[in-house]
């Protein structure tokens, strides 16, 4: 057959430009794409040979070979798979998104699909070679055709390609990339092995490269690496997650985890599971023993690697786990996951959602197992990842109850252990109808908060929350197992049956008796406080700040301001202890000129007690100094 010059189909030239300049953000992946295609071709041969063993042509050891020629500036990827006929080369290489494997799978039916280990969803992988090459030569012969019916396909990635017949003894396909000048670094065995190890290590076929050894120089010439004439396998050629779990030791899992996570420690927990059904996939997931430095960066890349049929697709498959589980490392290998044209982003689909739900449930089960059966490991886990786990209350409604059961908090009744909501409920006092908690900037601030005084007096436990995320997260959790959650720093204190009638009566009388001074305090503090009232929640402190139920706490407002966010102004309520000597002194000084200064000192001290800072520290110092003189 004479050489034919044919045109790519309409828009192909434009698409080639897109592929080579815009489609892939990382040029190294061209090798991933071409090795993936080679693996597909071998899988297709294996399937067709089930009915015609002669297609193997006495060569049933399927493999992929990668080699380069520095002098010619070429990189060659060769497989001994199914190969192509002349017509197939024209159809499959002349049309973007014309995938031979896609057409092949379409012809299958029933159980045959389960036996065809094909990727077949990526129509542009071959053209990624033009990222690094200004010319691509393809030589191929389809299994079963005579050597004289080989085909050569050549293109420079413009609007045309040449096709001619060639003599080719071996079955399969060779793709020769004529590298651009700025791609010469791919003529390096070390670099190529690194790319293969990263992207194609778990391809089930062996990937071979020419073996190199150090050769000493002669006649004072420097030594160099030289080819030995042998081939060596440069990938593992076996995906760990595809092996039976009974054949995998904890050491195997640990080494694999270290390889994919670049962590030096073994994982805290591991789950390996094959999911079958409408969506089929394998999950091998790990919980690290230590949190990474960027754990609180919600935009960080996720830790789950996505594979399709053991072919690496991406490092940060964020669609496969919710953001609050971003600490999880591992692999998801899907049999039928749909991907977009460049493989760089997952499409939203039922399959993706099913995998996300399955992986989330599996990780939560891992954490629950630690909590129930390995308390020391769970303690380690919670110290590292408890804060980000709380984010799930606002992100994952479906699993909110499971997450709530996993949360742990410090307590006003113990300094040595953390407690769960279930622990708290089990020791609630008779007549107590709420789970009480307080949020603060630090655990020390929470422990010393004036709002706890009445609860300590009555022996009522209060959960102490000092993570930055606590206030935000608890907006999404109003109750636990039927018992409401109540902040001791919001609304008026109401201990219900736990507060005796004498206390209630005394509080009401104080509000009435103390009304004139309360009104004067309101006027003096009208720019700072929305209200001033007497309270029964204080025992030793003169005053404290609270907000209305439903309002943003002062602690959350401070946190959001520090993060640079716009925060609506919420004036707190100043509650005063009518029995405290300082308040009594204030009452006696109500007609003095210094009253406003004393009122502001009282407010600012209450603000300081909860970890805040006076809006005008200099004015506060000046007022205190004047009081001391």
UniProtKB/Swiss-Prot annotation:
An example Gene Ontology molecular-function term: ATP hydrolysis activity
Cellular compartments annotated: Cytoplasm
Region (A): 1-343
Family per similarity comment: Belongs to the heat shock protein 90 family.
Keywords: ATP-binding, Chaperone, Cytoplasm, Nucleotide-binding, Stress response
Function: Molecular chaperone. Has ATPase activity.
Gene Ontology CC entries for this record: cytoplasm
Annotated disulfide bonds: none
Main localisation: cytoplasm
Residue numbers spanned by region C: 559-629
Taxonomic placement: Bacteria, Pseudomonadati, Pseudomonadota, Betaproteobacteria, Burkholderiales
InterPro entries hit by this protein: HATPase_C_sf, HSP90_C, Hsp90_fam, Hsp90_N, Ribosomal_Su5_D2-typ_SF
Cited PANTHER family: HEAT SHOCK PROTEIN 90 FAMILY MEMBER
Subunit structure: Homodimer.
Region annotation B: where it falls in the sequence: 344-558
Identification of the protein by name: Chaperone protein HtpG
């Amino acid at each position: 057959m004479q050489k034919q010059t044919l045109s790519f189909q309409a828009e192909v030239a434009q698409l080639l430009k897109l592929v080579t300049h815009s489609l892939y953000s990382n040029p190294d992946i061209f090798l991933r794409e071409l090795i993936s295609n080679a693996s597909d071709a071998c899988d297709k041969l294996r399937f067709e040979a089930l009915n015609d063993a002669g297609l193997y042509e006495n060569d049933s050891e399927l493999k992929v070979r990668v080699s380069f020629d520095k002098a010619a500036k070429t990189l060659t990827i060769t497989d001994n798979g199914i190969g192509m006929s002349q017509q197939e080369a024209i159809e499959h290489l002349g049309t973007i998104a014309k995938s031979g494997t896609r057409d092949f799978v379409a012809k299958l039916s029933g159980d045959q699909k389960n036996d065809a280990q094909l990727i077949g969803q990526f129509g542009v992988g071959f053209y990624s070679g033009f990222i690094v090459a200004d010319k691509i030569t393809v030589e191929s012969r389809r299994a079963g055709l005579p050597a004289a019916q080989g085909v050569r396909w050549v293109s420079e990635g413009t609007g045309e390609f040449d096709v001619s017949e060639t003599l080719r003894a071996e079955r399969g396909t060779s793709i020769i990339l004529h590298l651009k000048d700025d791609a010469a670094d791919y003529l390096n065995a070390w670099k190529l092995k690194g790319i293969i190890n990263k992207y194609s290590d778990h391809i089930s076929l062996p990937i071979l490269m020419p073996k190199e050894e150090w050769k000493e120089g002669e006649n004072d010439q420097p030594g160099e690496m030289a080819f030995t004439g042998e081939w060596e396998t440069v990938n593992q050629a076996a995906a760990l997650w595809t092996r039976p779990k009974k054949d995998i030791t904890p050491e195997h899992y640990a080494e694999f985890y270290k390889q994919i996570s670049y962590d030096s420690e073994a994982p805290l927990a591991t789950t390996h599971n094959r999911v079958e059904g409408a969506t089929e996939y394998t999950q091998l997931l790990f919980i690290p023993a230590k949190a990474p430095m960027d754990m609180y960066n919600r935009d960080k890349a996720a830790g789950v690697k996505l594979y399709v049929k053991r072919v690496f697709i991406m490092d940060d498959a964020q669609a496969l786990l919710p953001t609050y589980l971003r600490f999880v490392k591992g692999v998801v290998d899907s049999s039928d996951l749909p991907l977009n044209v460049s493989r760089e982003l997952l499409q939203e689909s039922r399959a993706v959602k099913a995998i996300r739900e399955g992986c989330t449930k599996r990780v939560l089960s891992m954490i629950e197992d630690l909590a129930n059966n390995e308390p020391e490991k769970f303690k380690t886990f919670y110290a590292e990842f408890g804060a980000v786990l709380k984010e799930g209350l606002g992100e994952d409604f479906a699993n909110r109850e499971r997450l709530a059961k996993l949360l742990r908090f410090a307590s006003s009744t113990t300094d040595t252990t953390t407690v769960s909501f279930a622990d708290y409920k089990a020791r609630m006092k008779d007549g107590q109808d709420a789970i009480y908690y307080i949020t603060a900037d630090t655990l020390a601030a929470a422990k010393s908060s004036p709002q706890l005084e009445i609860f300590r007096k009555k022996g009522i436990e209060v959960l102490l929350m000092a993570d930055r995320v606590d206030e935000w997260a608890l907006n999404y959790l109003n109750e636990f197992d039927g018992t409401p959650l109540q902040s001791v720093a919001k609304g008026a204190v109401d201990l219900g049956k736990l507060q005796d009638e004498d206390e209630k009566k005394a509080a009401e009388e104080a509000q009435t008796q103390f009304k004139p001074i309360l009104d004067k305090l309101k006027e003096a503090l009208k720019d700072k406080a929305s209200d001033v009232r007497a309270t029964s929640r204080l025992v030793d402190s003169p005053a404290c700040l609270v907000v209305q139920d439903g309002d943003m706490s002062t602690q959350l407002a401070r946190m959001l301001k520090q993060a640079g966010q716009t925060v609506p102004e919420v004036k707190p309520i100043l509650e005063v202890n009518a029995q405290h000597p300082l308040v009594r002194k204030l009452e006696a000084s109500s007609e003095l000129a210094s009253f406003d200064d004393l009122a502001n000192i009282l407010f600012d001290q209450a603000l300081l007690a909860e970890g805040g800072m006076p809006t005008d520290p200099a004015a506060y110092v000046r007022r205190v100094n004047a009081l001391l003189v």
